Regions:
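Positively charged n-region of N-terminal signal peptides that target proteins for export
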Residues: 1-5
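Scaffold/interface architecture of coatomer-like assemblies
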Residues: 26-317
Length: 317
């Protein structure tokens, strides 16, 4: 998922609107092909330095197993295609230490470009309580920030709330992303292990909707705020969620709060500025389902970051 290119394509605007208005990262009819193309947002990340080199369509390779798929489009999400809806999703179970970060979150929201609409929601009892719908009025969005309730039992599972946000978020012709601020602990599921079904469901929901989730860890309230075991699993869950949706999780500190969110917010901003829409032709299958994919580039020194799978509709008869 990374930046800058200047692609031609007179059909790009039509293609982009068609792709995103449907939901995102699954196969739909491509405006550039009579075959069904799958679409996924990719972030381009330099291995060294701060600015990635130019990546062209012919530099991108998509694999399903050992089979290479045809790349149809590679559109830089800049200029006329820079539209983004970004939700800041805050866990109301967070401890009061989050209060020291609110000013930096507010500055991050207010610094977004005019092409970005920002929304704010709070996780409460498994529901995403929307305090501000996505808006281009960034000052208005920033006003929706407040201290978390920090009361035990407020949040059933942060992953219930994420799924709820995804399902109530209207389809749009813009890219969509979530910044999730939470300790990641699933108090509803209880024990920490690799089988949390609510985390898996949230990953599926976000993936099918083409929504990239990034996360910043912040300690919760009460006993879990200083439980190494619970904090460990909470951060593992946040990392898995971000990795599997094409985002990034920040701060592996376990029981303590991050000193500052600023480095993470700056990194997130750079990621959002270096994204492309990739369209490719997956192998035809009779049944709809997830396809595991692997991205490579002919250009040295860059990583192409995306969800590791894409939802593909059944082959039309």
């Amino acid at each position: 998922m990374r930046t800058s290119i200047s692609l031609l394509l007179s059909t790009a605007a039509v293609s982009l609107a068609w792709i995103f208005s449907g939901q995102g990262a699954w196969a739909q009819q491509s405006a550039t092909s009579t075959e069904a193309a799958a679409h996924i947002v990719v972030t381009v990340e330099p291995k060294h330095g701060s600015s990635p080199p130019e990546i062209r369509k012919e530099d991108v390779m998509v694999y399903e197993g050992h089979d290479r798929d045809q790349v149809v489009d590679w559109i830089p999400l800049q200029g006329d295609h820079a539209g983004l809806q970004l939700f800041v999703l805050i866990d109301d179970e967070s401890g009061m230490s989050l209060g020291t970060q609110l000013d930096d979150i507010r500055k991050f929201i207010e610094s977004q470009p005019p092409t970005t609409k920002v929304g704010v929601a709070y996780m409460q009892n498994g529901i995403a309580r929307v305090a501000q719908d996505p808006t281009s009025d960034h000052a208005q969005a920033a006003k929706a920030l407040r201290l978390p309730m920090g009361a035990g039992g407020v949040n059933a599972s942060p992953y219930f709330s994420l799924s709820d946000l995804v399902k109530k978020w209207p389809a749009t012709n813009e890219r969509r992303a979530v910044l999730m601020i939470s300790d990641g602990i699933d108090r509803y599921y209880g024990t920490g292990d690799l089988q949390d079904p609510y985390l898996d469901a949230a990953i599926d929901d976000a993936g099918k909707a083409g929504i990239i989730v990034s996360a910043i860890y912040t300690p919760g309230a009460g006993h879990f705020a200083h439980s190494y075991w619970q904090s460990y699993w909470g951060q593992i869950y946040l990392s898995e969620l971000a990795d599997k949706t094409g985002g990034e999780a920040y701060y592996i500190g376990f029981t303590g709060a991050p000193v500052s969110f600023v480095p993470y917010l700056q990194t997130l901003e750079k990621r959002l500025q270096n994204q492309y829409l990739l369209s490719f032709l997956p192998k035809p299958e009779k049944k709809a389902g997830w396809r595991q994919i692997r991205l490579q580039s002919e250009i040295a020194g860059v990583d192409l970051i995306s969800a590791g799978r894409v939802w593909v509709a059944a082959e039309e008869k």
